[in-house]
Amino acid sequence: MNRPNRINEEIRVKEVRLIDQNGEQAGIVSIQQALEMMAEQAELDLVEISPNAEPPVCRIMNYGKFLYEKSKTAKEQKKKQKVVQVKEIKFRPGTDEGDYQVKLRSLIRFLEDGDKAKITVRFRGREMAHQDIGLDVLERVKNDLAEISVVESAPGKLEGRQAVMVLAPKKK
């Protein structure tokens, strides 16, 4: 069986630093003494906690309960982690005020949820002649969201027929 920790008779060293079930140091003892102490406190296992220490550190505990607690804390930590996503909102150079406000509210929601926001301004046809209008839209978005975000990548040159800017939420 492949376990992260060796237990009981799997421990193949002469001496171990023993910690009893109360978490108190019992000192350095032979492996036989440790197994006998474990037998006295029936239903408990001798678990190798730190195999690389000199001598290895072993603890008397209920191994099943130990594994359960370990997996429970790992699940809790995994729950707390948040995967940052990049949400995209597309504008046009001629986006009207009402649409602009709706899209701005969406951007605020994305940033408050901890996601990054990618703002794209797409140019069609003759709009390419007025790229400055599109860049003004990006500048306006940047200024409106300055309190809750930082610019991660500023709009430089156009990528094909679109200008792109990425905003990240400010650290609290």
Swiss-Prot record:
Subcellular location: Cytoplasm
One example of a Gene Ontology biological process annotation: ribosome disassembly
GO molecular function: ribosome binding; translation initiation factor activity
Pfam families per the UniProt record, alphabetical: IF3_C, IF3_N
Keyword Cytoplasm set for record: yes
Record flagged with keyword Protein biosynthesis: yes
Residues the UniProt record annotates as site (Important for 30S binding): Y100, K103
A GO-annotated cellular component: cytosol
Function: IF-3 binds to the 30S ribosomal subunit and shifts the equilibrium between 70S ribosomes and their 50S and 30S subunits in favor of the free subunits, thus enhancing the availability of 30S subunits on which protein synthesis initiation begins.
Protein family: Belongs to the IF-3 family.
Subunit structure of this chain's protein: Monomer.
Annotated protein name in UniProt: Translation initiation factor IF-3
Origin species: Haemophilus influenzae (strain ATCC 51907 / DSM 11121 / KW20 / Rd)
